[in-house]
Amino acid sequence: MSEWSRIAVEFGEQQLNLTELEDFARELAYEGLDPALIIKKLKETGGDDWVKDTKFIIVFALTRGNKIVKASGKMSNSGSKRLMALQEKYGLVERAETRLSITPVRVAQSLPTWTCAAAAALKEYLPVGPAVMNLKVENYPPEMMCMAFGSLIPTAGVSEATTKTLMEAYSLWQDAFTKTINVKMRGASKTEVYNSFRDPLHAAVNSVFFPNDVRVKWLKAKGILGPDGVPSRAAEVAAAAYRNL
């Protein structure tokens, strides 16, 4: 046995330290955005107008996405002027290059309860709304029809099975949305599509920014979870539909 072979064998005898491994994994985990920094920038920049401005940005994200320049040329003159003014005011960008980049979608993801409630109210304006989802399953929860719902899936206060069911139910919309906005994905396999949104989804679900107790309370209020914390029938059906894709 060579010296290097011996070292490899001895390395394999190192005891696994679960705490150390989990610390490494957390340090290396996908981190797409920092909601606290985004909200701080919005509030400090916007002053008294930050809430109204932010709601406008979120509705834009829900209905048009991140393509500010392209979308501004295909809307009312007043809407275009307001959008471009907000882009300059808050430094909005169309593509997130760093954790500090502020895109319309990131603004929406940073404020998930308001965003998801707005999605349910604006459902007919969504790029992938009830007209699409109700062809897949009946009564698909409208709050799930947006990019912010992952931040509301709890990892505490409910069973692991409940977390898994909600992630699968939400993935049904994510699959449809990905294929809608990305032409290259329309012929892709379920696994390929899932891999395209897997990391951001898991990052949102596992984020500690939005408290789990607030997530559970909100989901119960919307009927997505029952009083006992069990997923609604609609969520269960949606999860099954995703598994069967």
Swiss-Prot record:
It holds the Pfam family Tenui_N. One of its GO terms (cellular component) is ribonucleoprotein complex. It comes from the Viruses. One of its GO terms (molecular function) is RNA binding. Its main location: virion. The keyword RNA-binding applies. The record marks 64, 67, 70, 95, 106, 184 as: RNA-binding. Keywords: Capsid protein, Host cytoplasm, Host Golgi apparatus, Host nucleus, Ribonucleoprotein, RNA-binding, Viral nucleoprotein, Virion. RNA binds at residues 30, 67, 106, 186, 196. It is found in: Virion; Host cytoplasm; Host nucleus; Host endoplasmic reticulum-Golgi intermediate compartment. Encapsidates the genomic RNA, protecting it from nucleases. Displays high affinity for single-stranded nucleic acid. The encapsidated genomic RNA is termed the nucleocapsid (NC) or ribonucleoprotein. The ribonucleoprotein has a non-helical structure. Serves as template for viral transcription and replication. After replication, the nucleocapsid is recruited to the host Golgi apparatus by glycoprotein Gn for packaging into virus particles. Belongs to the phlebovirus nucleocapsid protein family. Homodimer. Homohexamer; ring-shaped, necessary to form the nucleocapsid. Homopentamers; opened pentamers in solution. Binds to viral genomic RNA. Interacts with glycoprotein Gn; this interaction allows packaging of nucleocapsids into virions. Binds suramin, which inhibits the replication of SFTSV in vitro. The N-terminus is involved in homooligomerization. This is Nucleoprotein. It comes from Dabie bandavirus.
